[in-house]
Amino acid sequence: MTTKNVTDENFESEVLKADKPTLVDFWAEWCGPCKQIGPILEEISNEMRSEVVIAKHNIDDHPNQSTKYGVRGIPTMLLFKGGELKATKVGATTKSNIVSWI
């Protein structure tokens, strides 16, 4: 399993109504730190697929959700459980930090 791309249009069905906790990575193509954590999130997605969904949301292509959730810098990771925002992490970090944060 790889990370899932989410858009403004499918955010509710793919994130808010998900049956598992969902980590959403708000990112952009031009963002260097976003490119750093991309492969890390792919690894986590593969290793923890039974526990959590890892989703990516491109803020340039789909700006509505980033505005709604007050994303001001990227990468920003938001963790949703049961349709509610539970935690926020801003900036690139290590795999072990992301896993323990989840």
Segments predicted by a language model, with ranges:
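Conserved Rossmann-like nucleotide-binding pocket used by diverse enzymes
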Residues: 2, 7, 27, 55
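Structural microenvironment flanking redox-active thiols in thiol-disulfide oxidoreductases
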Residues: 59-65
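Conserved helix-turn-beta segment immediately C-terminal to the redox Cys motif
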Residues: 19-21, 36-57
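A short beta-strand-turn-helix
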Residues: 4-22, 63
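Conserved redox-active cysteine motifs that mediate thiol-disulfide chemistry
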Residues: 26-40
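Non-catalytic, surface beta->alpha helical segment in thiol-disulfide oxidoreductase systems
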Residues: 73, 78-102
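Short pre-active-site segment immediately N-terminal to redox-active cysteine/selenocysteine motifs
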Residues: 19-20, 26-30, 73
